[in-house]
Amino acid sequence: MATIMRVNNLTSKTELKKGMKLLIPNTRGPRANIPLFPTTRWTHIVIHHTATDQGSAYSIDGLHHQRGWENGMGYDFLIDNGTRGKTVGQIEVGPRWIKQMDGAHTKQGDWNKKAIGIAVVGNYSETGLPDKMFDSLIFLVVTLKGFYHIPDKNIVGHRDVPGSATECPGKFFPWNEFKRRIRMF
């Protein structure tokens, strides 16, 4: 009970109310299998949005090839929004991750060499992130940060990469809740 109270910022059992949504730590349903590779190169995580209404790893890969990116999809992971035959919150692993290649998700300095790029399908400058996608993002980030020992301060939005001139992953991305949730693990 103490752990549940701590992760939900409750100081007393009397604060619990009927119908209240609580985070229950250390519970897991079926989850995506995230391939993890022994390396020390990954020191940061950069969160993006695709700024598109729909997408999948296959369609984003094609779009990035059209832009002249020889190795296709610039992100390491993509979280789907339920379009293009995918389910809401489905985590797709990109070929760059499988091959442990540099990303192509930010133009700044050495960030593509040291940062894992995760994109959520959608435009979060126009709307909020659906809960299932948010939960998948939290699961993925917590998995990666734990395995690669990435400190919370090194988990940023694309807009927070020094020298970036973008709103990505969007003004409606729930940063405060995101930071709160990843700190719990």
Question: Where do the protein language model's features map onto the residues?
Answer:
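Residues at or immediately flanking beta-strands
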Residues: 15, 74-76, 154
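Alpha-helical scaffolding within the catalytic cores
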Residues: 30-34, 96-107
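Extracellular LysM carbohydrate-binding repeats and other cell-envelope/extracellular binding modules
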Residues: 1-33
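Short, conserved "active-site rim" segments that organize catalytic pockets and cofactor/ligand binding
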Residues: 35-99
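Basic/polar, cationic surfaces and motifs that engage anionic cell-wall
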Residues: 35-43, 80-93, 106-115, 120-185
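Solvent-exposed coil/turn segments that connect beta secondary-structure elements
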Residues: 9, 21, 27-29, 50-52, ...
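Residue-level detector of conserved, well-ordered beta-strand and adjacent loop positions
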Residues: 5, 48, 119
